[in-house]
Amino acid sequence: MDTKKLTVISLGAGVQSSTMALMAAHGEITPMPDYAIFADTQAEPKHIYTWLDWIETQLPFPLIRVTAGSLKEAVLNGKDRFAPPPFYTSTESGEKEGLLRRQCTREYKIAPIQKKIRELAGYKPRQRIPVGTVEQWIGISLDEMQRMKDAPERWCDNRW
């Protein structure tokens, strides 16, 4: 097994992760990632797919697209495991109450990316991975600091 740390960008195709990918492509942040990985819910706006097609031409490292299936189809057809999208709730008077639990992020974004990272690192499902094998870059701005959390898997170090 190669002892070099695998470096990946979790590319959400938003401002932060796209900026990180482009800065890395120009050598402004290092090390050069081995891959960028985009988790496709198959329900993204058209401009996201257009952006991904463009940014892919700018990167010296592969952009890999993964999916757990269609979030839209799961919601509309009530698939076996319902992973609700981040819907906002409101009171009867129309005031915002908050977000429903964001289970879809785990099932449609995080899990497919982790599965691909395991594969790229050369590990099978449930196979033990040494601590610190992967560095995953996640684009989060300072106003979203509450989202910055350590990876639950010890084999992955998150970097923002």
Language model feature labels by segment:
Residues 1-160:
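Nucleotide-activated chemistry modules centered on ATP-dependent adenylation/adenylyltransferase
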